[in-house]
Structures are given as structure tokens and as C-alpha cells.
């Protein structure tokens, strides 16, 4: 057959081709020059797909579709596509409190009380001194959505602090986060100025930027130093004698200076020596093992009673007191937390309240040890050593002002009873929250 160009076409019979050891039939159409029959001018293979190739294409399409669906799911669950959480928006009738240091001894007890009183609580803690076990206990007690959230963060990180405040709608801040050992502060003063003074400044700045209007600041009687006159009132001159007290006073000064031109409601609570634990047995004091030497006298008594240490070391027997040992005002943690909640309830815009939180009664270290022996039922061995640097002889409060203004008074004032409550938790949790 000829066409106008003098080229003829010829259809050849299908020929087998081998691909990977398999033969398939591929019909082929060739074009010849009729002047030169042996010359192939062109060829066109006809469409033909191996069944396995079709299956591979289908599989790829399904894979692409699956990945597309997965991407849609991930995007839809991202923060920009989900509805705001309860913590990120204000709700009428609900007060959202940021509790810094809320995994610590006092902070966790405060969080428990706030949650029990139907506050919404966000705990921020870097766990350098706090216990994740305390947070888990609170989460188990209050599992409902929108009640409690925990954020692992360091207040010394300004980006983290800004993120926390920008993503949450706080109504108030209870600022407990700090390092709080007098002896340690004399060894590592810069750590104390950073963690107490500098971090408080960061929190205060974030509150100002995000218009959080209430601050309850956890301060200390250590800001008074060693006053010449007892008891200590809120007007007693503040002359701290160790870096812990100095760092706290500097933080107080910053807050007071800021409040002069702010509508923020501020409460500063200067409290004394904290003991005890939750009467319900849910929380307790559990310092890290490496910090036990720096810890409170109650912790040392309990360690001695359990045989974790050979005995109790009392540092200083030559103070100008009745028995030569330091005199302190021991406040039960349950009473202390109650004072914080009352301060939160009574805080007023453009006003500052400063209060001592104590029982108004001083007890010597020797008295404390005897009470601890009775509470534990163990005859604790006591070694008397030289004074600890930075300590002071006698400190106890005059709680008249807090009674008058906030209608607060200490209820758990029996030293032995408070120690018995704490001892019950210690016996069940000999290794702290790791005992679960």
C-alpha cells in the first residue's frame, strides 16, 4: 500500500519482549520507505501495561491519598485550628491562678487548697526543687478538664515566661518559686539573687504586659534579719543578714516600687518557719536527697527517726536564748496556705498589703526536738555543733495585723500535733513521692 509521500506502512505480528524474565506481547507498527524497504523510518508502540504496573500505580495513589488525609488531621489538631482551651480564656465566676513553684512543698499545698476551693490552677515549675509526684497527685485528685494544668518551665527563661502568659488568661499569680535555704545562700549567693530577685522581676514584667492584676508574693521573715526587739511587726526594720533574706527584700522592693504607679493588687506575706503537711495525707514535704542537709529541721528529725541518718545535728548552742538554741516561730503549712487564700480574696486594686504569717509564739530548737521525739515515738540521737553561718538567735512574729485585716489566725499551733501529721505522710512515703 502506497501513500502520497511514497512511504508504505506494514503491520507486523505481535512480538514477545522479555522484562525481568517475563514475556509480554507488544503489537508494534513500523513505517518503511518503499524505495528502500530495509530502512525503517519510524515506529510507534501501541499502549500496553502489565497488570502489575497498574497495581503499583493504584498503590501509589492510595499512599498519596493516605498522606493527604493524615496531613489534614494533623493540621486540624494544631493550635490554630482547635478551639481555645479553658486556660486560655477568662470565664465568668472562675478565677485562674498561676502558682509558680507549685510542685514544691508549700506551692503544692497552696494548689491543693485553691483547687479544693474551685479555683482554676496552672502550676509552673522547673522541678529543680519541686516534685513531679506532687503534681501527679493533684492531677489524680482533680482530673476534670479545665481545673489544673502543669507547665514545665524555668522562670529564668524570658521566652518561656512570655509564652506562658501569652497562652493563658491568668487572673492572679501566687509566686512561690524560689530557692530557700539560708545556709546554701551563703555558699551560692548569686544563685539566690538570680532565682529570687531576677526571676521575680521577670514575672512582674510579664504580669504588667498581660494585665494580670493580682500578685500574692511569698516572702520571708528572713528579710528582718536579727531585730533587736521581739516580736516582729510589719514595721520592724528590714536588715537581712544572709543572701536569702537580701534577695527576698530586693524582690519586695521591686514590687513596691512598681505598685506605686500601677493598679495592681499586691499582697506580700512574710512567713516564718513552715512545718506540717496536708491533714488528709495527700501531700507532704519531700526535699531532694542532695538537699537534705540544707533542709528544714523537721525533715532532719524525720530522717533521724527513720534511721536514714545517724542522728540530728543541732547547730548552735551559744545563742542568747533560754536554752542556748535558736528560737523560731513554727507555722503549719495548712495555716500558711489559708493566709494566702485570704490574701487573694482580700486583695484590692492599687493597694499593697504586707503581713507577717506566724503563730506569735517562739519555740527553741531543743523544744522542737523534744516534740519531734514524741511525735515519732523515736528517741532521736542529737549532736550539738557550732553555729550555722547567717543564722540569727530569735525570731517570732506579731500576727495582730493579719488578724485585723484578713481575719486570719493560726489554728494548728500544737507543735507535736503538726509533726505527727507530717510524720504519718513520711512513714508511708519514706522516699518521698518516689515511694508510690
Curated annotation (Swiss-Prot):
Keywords: Carbohydrate metabolism, Golgi apparatus, Isomerase, Membrane, NAD, Signal-anchor, Transmembrane, Transmembrane helix. It comes from the Eukaryota. It catalyses: UDP-beta-L-arabinopyranose = UDP-alpha-D-xylose. InterPro entries: NAD(P)-bd_dom (IPR016040), NAD(P)-bd_dom_sf (IPR036291), UDP_G4E (IPR005886). GO terms for biological process: capsule polysaccharide biosynthetic process; galactose metabolic process; UDP-L-arabinose biosynthetic process. GO terms for molecular function: UDP-arabinose 4-epimerase activity; UDP-glucose 4-epimerase activity. Residues 1-20 are annotated as: Disordered. Its EC number is 5.1.3.5. This is Putative UDP-arabinose 4-epimerase 4. The lineage of its organism: Eukaryota, Viridiplantae, Streptophyta, Embryophyta, Tracheophyta.
Amino acid at each position: 500500500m502506497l501513500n502520497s509521500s511514497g512511504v508504505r506502512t506494514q503491520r507486523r505480528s505481535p512480538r514477545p519482549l522479555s522484562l525481568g524474565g517475563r514475556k509480554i506481547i507488544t503489537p508494534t507498527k513500523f513505517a518503511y520507505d518503499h524505495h528502500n524497504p530495509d530502512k525503517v523510518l519510524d515506529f510507534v508502540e501501541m499502549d500496553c501495561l502489565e497488570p502489575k504496573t497498574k497495581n503499583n500505580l493504584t498503590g501509589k495513589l492510595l499512599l498519596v491519598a493516605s498522606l493527604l488525609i493524615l496531613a489534614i488531621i494533623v493540621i486540624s489538631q494544631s493550635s490554630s485550628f482547635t478551639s481555645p482551651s479553658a486556660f486560655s480564656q477568662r470565664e465568668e465566676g472562675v478565677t485562674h491562678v498561676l502558682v509558680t513553684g507549685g510542685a514544691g512543698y508549700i506551692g503544692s499545698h497552696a494548689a491543693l487548697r485553691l483547687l479544693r476551693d474551685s479555683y482554676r490552677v496552672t502550676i509552673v515549675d522547673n522541678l529543680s526543687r519541686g516534685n513531679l509526684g506532687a503534681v501527679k497527685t493533684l492531677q489524680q485528685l482533680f482530673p476534670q478538664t479545665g481545673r489544673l494544668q502543669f507547665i514545665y518551665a524555668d522562670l529564668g527563661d524570658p521566652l518561656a515566661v512570655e509564652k506562658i502568659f501569652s497562652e493563658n488568661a491568668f487572673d492572679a499569680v501566687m509566686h512561690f518559686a524560689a530557692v530557700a535555704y539560708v545556709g546554701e545562700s551563703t555558699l551560692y549567693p548569686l544563685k539566690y539573687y538570680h532565682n529570687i530577685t531576677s526571676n521575680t522581676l521577670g514575672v512582674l514584667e510579664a504580669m504588667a504586659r498581660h494585665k494580670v492584676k493580682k500578685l500574692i508574693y511569698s516572702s520571708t521573715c528572713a528579710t528582718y534579719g536579727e531585730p533587736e526587739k521581739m516580736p516582729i511587726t510589719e514595721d520592724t526594720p528590714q536588715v537581712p543578714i544572709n543572701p536569702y533574706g537580701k534577695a527576698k527584700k530586693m524582690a519586695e522592693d521591686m514590687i513596691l516600687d512598681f505598685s506605686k504607679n500601677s493598679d495592681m493588687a499586691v499582697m506580700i506575706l512574710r512567713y516564718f518557719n513552715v512545718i506540717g503537711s496536708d491533714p488528709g495525707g495527700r501531700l507532704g514535704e519531700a526535699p531532694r536527697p542532695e538537699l537534705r542537709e540544707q533542709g528544714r529541721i523537721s525533715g532532719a528529725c524525720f530522717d533521724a527517726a527513720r534511721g536514714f541518718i545517724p542522728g540530728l545535728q543541732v547547730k548552735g548552742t551559744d545563742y542568747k536564748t533560754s536554752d542556748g538554741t535558736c528560737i523560731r516561730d513554727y507555722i503549719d503549712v495548712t495555716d500558711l496556705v489559708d493566709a494566702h487564700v485570704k490574701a487573694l480574696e482580700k486583695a484590692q486594686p492599687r493597694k499593697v498589703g504586707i503581713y507577717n504569717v506566724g503563730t506569735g509564739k517562739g519555740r527553741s530548737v531543743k523544744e522542737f526536738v523534744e516534740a519531734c521525739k514524741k511525735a515519732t515515738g523515736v528517741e532521736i540521737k542529737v549532736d550539738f555543733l557550732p553555729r550555722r553561718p547567717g543564722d540569727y538567735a530569735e525570731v517570732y512574729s506579731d500576727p495582730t495585723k493579719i488578724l485585723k485585716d484578713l481575719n486570719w489566725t493560726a489554728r494548728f499551733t500544737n507543735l507535736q500535733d503538726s509533726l505527727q501529721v507530717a510524720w504519718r505522710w513520711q512513714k508511708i512515703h519514706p522516699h518521698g513521692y518516689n515511694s508510690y
